[in-house]
Amino acid sequence: MNIHEYQAKEILRSYGVSVPNGRVAFTVDEAVEAAKELGAPVCVVKAQIHAGGRGKAGGVKVAKSLEEVRTYASELLGKVLVTHQTGPEGKEVKRLLIEEGCDIQKEYYIGLVVDRATSRVVLMGSEEGGTEIEEVAAKTPEKIFKEYIDPAVGLQAFQARRLAFNINIPKHLVNQAVKFMMGLYQVFVDKDCSIAEINPLVVTGDGKVMALDAKLNFDSNALYRHPDILEYRDLDEEDPKEVEASKYDLNYIALDGNIGCMVNGAGLAMATMDIIKYYGGEPANFLDVGGGASEEKVREAFKIILSDPNVKGIFVNIFGGIMKCDVIASGIVAATKQVGLTLPLVVRLEGTNVELGKKILQESGLNIIAAESMADGAQKIVELVR
């Protein structure tokens, strides 16, 4: 789960991690009032959307008066911001962060992620802050320093100190930087984060180390033990189809193609998308109905797939283990009748009760195209949507 920058900073502040003073605003008047409360000679008006690259897209403005705050807030609220992370459709700005301006002397990058190769959390740092860290990693990987954290003992002060020296934090501010990194790590562990990223971490003219921007993502599987974090969820920032799918415990991710996919099991779902690509098609989604799907779940899965106007055909690929093929077949027939499906539908069934499942499809009287294998099914649906 993702949250907004201002929400991430609220969490960091509660852990003693230094962030600029700021207020969230939902209207132009609230933005001006927030700037008045801050009383700073310079304020920054920042669009709040779940995407990076806001500055380059014109979503971050520096205001030197209340009039400028009003002007920038009017420009940004309701604007569709397009960044390299939003896709061409962009995201509408519905809230702003009004923040005190900082006298920035130097920008750095600090981040925490789970490294799957070592099964450890890794603390990363670079003095190339304020830029895309992926770009730095690709062009000048030697400028990124890493500290691998032993889960038994957590981040040690000597590791944070070593990283601070490696990225050339001024010596008189190293202790501040160490405290900052230790606090950030505590947030990462306590809140079950998947990413904690500060870009940029800045050194200010008055000798402070603080997070000018903050990104926290959370492991959705751990949210049951973090009701406080769940309250930060902003459904407006999520794909409506993905929100609807989550109500039925369906794992759905929207993609840019035109072939809808319904599969049981994440591995098979990824293989299905791969084979569609192999035969020249483009999957419109990842959709895993899980191992214990009912007819209702199958029906809702169909509705969600069809709510995407780009979908020109559907490929159902089921291997029945716990999931029985006859249940899937009944769900497919019911869903097809209920939604009045007119698009090409290719179904490949294999496993438990497969013959019964095929019989249900054959006797349904519907135009359902059977596939003998995954490759056969992929080829058929790709040809049908061309």
UniProtKB/Swiss-Prot annotation:
Superkingdom assignment: Bacteria
InterPro entries: ATP-grasp, ATP-grasp_succ-CoA_synth-type, ATP_grasp_subdomain_1, Succ-CoA_synthase_bsu_CS, SUCC_ACL_C, Succ_CoA_ligase-like_bsu, Succinyl-CoA_synth-like
GO biological process: succinyl-CoA metabolic process; tricarboxylic acid cycle
Binding annotation for substrate: 264, 321-323
Ranges for domain ATP-grasp: 9-244
Entry keyword Metal-binding: yes
EC id: 6.2.1.5
Functional pathway: Carbohydrate metabolism; tricarboxylic acid cycle; succinate from succinyl-CoA (ligase route): step 1/1
Gene3D superfamilies attached to this UniProt entry: ATP-grasp fold, A domain, ATP-grasp fold, B domain, Succinyl-CoA synthetase domains
Binding site residues for ATP: 46, 53-55, 99, 102, 107
Cofactor(s) this protein requires: Mg(2+)
Annotated PROSITE patterns: ATP_GRASP (PS50975), SUCCINYL_COA_LIG_3 (PS01217)
GO molecular function, one term: succinate-CoA ligase (ADP-forming) activity
Keyword annotations from UniProtKB, A to Z: ATP-binding, Ligase, Magnesium, Metal-binding, Nucleotide-binding, Tricarboxylic acid cycle
Recorded catalytic activity of this chain's protein: succinate + ATP + CoA = succinyl-CoA + ADP + phosphate; GTP + succinate + CoA = succinyl-CoA + GDP + phosphate
Note accompanying the cofactor annotation: Binds 1 Mg(2+) ion per subunit.
Pfam families per UniProt: ATP-grasp_2 (PF08442), Ligase_CoA (PF00549)
Cellular component aspect of the GO annotation: cytosol; succinate-CoA ligase complex
Family: Belongs to the succinate/malate CoA ligase beta subunit family.
Entries under HAMAP family matching the protein: Succ_CoA_beta
Quaternary state and interactors: Heterotetramer of two alpha and two beta subunits.
Biological role stated in the UniProt entry: Succinyl-CoA synthetase functions in the citric acid cycle (TCA), coupling the hydrolysis of succinyl-CoA to the synthesis of either ATP or GTP and thus represents the only step of substrate-level phosphorylation in the TCA. The beta subunit provides nucleotide specificity of the enzyme and binds the substrate succinate, while the binding sites for coenzyme A and phosphate are found in the alpha subunit.
Protein name: Succinate--CoA ligase [ADP-forming] subunit beta
